[in-house]
């Protein structure tokens, strides 16, 4: 309700967003975003939103290995992954988007400058989307807890998670 009342607060994690918006409301909002009808009028998943969801989950899985048992770090990692495609989705510059959103400073720095561990992890996840496997070498060299096998497992789990959101679409409409 505080969002509806116009209160300005810093959202620091996905859990915090759930507390403020409510789990059901946040879930519906995310599903609406992920499964909006594309401009061509065809029903289906917006590929950029699906990629953003995949990035978020992969970042979260990597975070759990890089900084174990730190929920805040994992939540921030998820946010960085999800938000990393906002410029393409919204047609705006990242700096302009972040000026309008109350997010943690480390999230902003990762999204603007690839700073900190979140920035390194984002660089790694983006490298997995490149056709050149050599693109992984540089970011992997800075994340000693991550190897190619673990990264592959994270990518598989992240994609399965994002695809699972689409399968839940039908049941969300009847809730």
For every predicted segment, state its role:
Residues 1-175:
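Conserved alpha-helical "signature site"
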């Amino acid at each position: 309700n505080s969002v509806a009342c116009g209160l300005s607060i810093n959202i620091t994690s996905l859990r915090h967003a759930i507390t403020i918006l409510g789990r059901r409301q946040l879930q519906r909002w995310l599903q609406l975003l992920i499964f909006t009808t594309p401009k061509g009028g065809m029903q289906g998943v917006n590929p950029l939103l699906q990629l953003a969801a995949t990035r978020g989950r992969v970042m979260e899985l990597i975070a759990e290995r890089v900084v174990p048992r730190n929920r805040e770090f994992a939540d921030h990692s998820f946010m960085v992954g999800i938000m990393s495609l906002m410029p393409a989705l919204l047609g705006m510059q990242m700096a302009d988007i972040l000026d309008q959103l109350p997010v943690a400073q480390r999230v902003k720095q990762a999204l603007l400058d690839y700073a900190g561990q979140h920035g390194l992890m984002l660089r790694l996840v983006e490298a997995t989307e490149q056709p050149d496997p050599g693109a992984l070498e540089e970011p992997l060299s800075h994340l000693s807890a991550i190897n190619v096998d673990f990264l592959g497992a994270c990518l598989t789990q992240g994609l399965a998670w994002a695809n699972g959101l689409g399968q839940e679409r039908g049941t969300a409409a009847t809730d």
